[in-house]
Amino acid sequence: MIFKDYDFLQNYDLKNFEEKVKIYKELLSKFNRIHNLTHLKNIDENIFDSIKILDFYDFSKAKNIADIGSGAGFPVVFLAFLLQSNFHLFEPNPKKAAFLRTLKIECELPNLHIYKEKVQEYKNTFKADIITSRALMDVKPLLEICKNLKDENTVFILWKGSEIYQELENIKDYEIFENNLRRYCILK
């Protein structure tokens, strides 16, 4: 994938990003053979899906970003390759958390913090400026389990499908951006 062709990425260090993406792909291939972390077929397409949000939302003021159910790192690992924010990844699955820790070391990402626990069990010392999640659960339960990380200024950015419209019933103050079948939902 040629990232330099995308206007929304022009202000980022794409050489460094592409080096980290290469490391990511190698590690994922290695871990997937043993631990079956993900069934995704088109990794490049999912990487693009992870960073396309930068075309719709400005992350520059976010100091702390929490990701719920980080799995194999989509979407926030790729944002962490580009942004200086502190990324807090909550992944209770030991194999997936081990993969994320290895990735942090191999890609030299001091801004990545991995928690091998459910977010609702975390005794936090920070409030997230942004909370992200990719297709983990419906919106309302997600808002509930994240209550210990959020305050009145926290923004939720969710990678969802077309079902998002039903999930947002009785919820106000949101925006949805569409890219093919993906719905990027920003809840304020």
UniProtKB/Swiss-Prot annotation:
Residues binding S-adenosyl-L-methionine are 69, 74, 119-120, 134
SUPFAM superfamilies on file: S-adenosyl-L-methionine-dependent methyltransferases
InterPro entries linked: rRNA_ssu_MeTfrase_G, SAM-dependent_MTases_sf
Keywords, A to Z, come to: Cytoplasm, Methyltransferase, rRNA processing, S-adenosyl-L-methionine, Transferase
Which class of enzymes does this protein belong to?
Answer: transferase
- Gene Ontology terms: cellular component: cytosol
Its Enzyme Commission number(s) read 2.1.1.170
**Gene3D superfamilies per UniProt:** Vaccinia Virus protein VP39 (3.40.50.150)
Record's Pfam families? Answer: GidB (PF02527)
Q: Where in the cell is it found?
A: Cytoplasm
Catalyzed reactions per annotation:
guanosine(527) in 16S rRNA + S-adenosyl-L-methionine = N(7)-methylguanosine(527) in 16S rRNA + S-adenosyl-L-homocysteine
A single GO molecular function term of this UniProt record: rRNA (guanine-N7-)-methyltransferase activity
Q: Which PANTHER family match?
A: S-ADENOSYL-L-METHIONINE-DEPENDENT METHYLTRANSFERASES SUPERFAMILY PROTEIN
Task: Outline what the protein does.
Answer: Specifically methylates the N7 position of guanine in position 527 of 16S rRNA.
Q: Which NCBIfam families match?
A: rsmG_gidB (TIGR00138)
Q: Which family does it belong to?
A: Belongs to the methyltransferase superfamily. RNA methyltransferase RsmG family.
Instruction: Please state what the protein is called.
Output: Ribosomal RNA small subunit methyltransferase G
Organism field:
Campylobacter jejuni subsp. jejuni serotype O:2 (strain ATCC 700819 / NCTC 11168)
Identify the gene encoding this protein.
Answer: rsmG
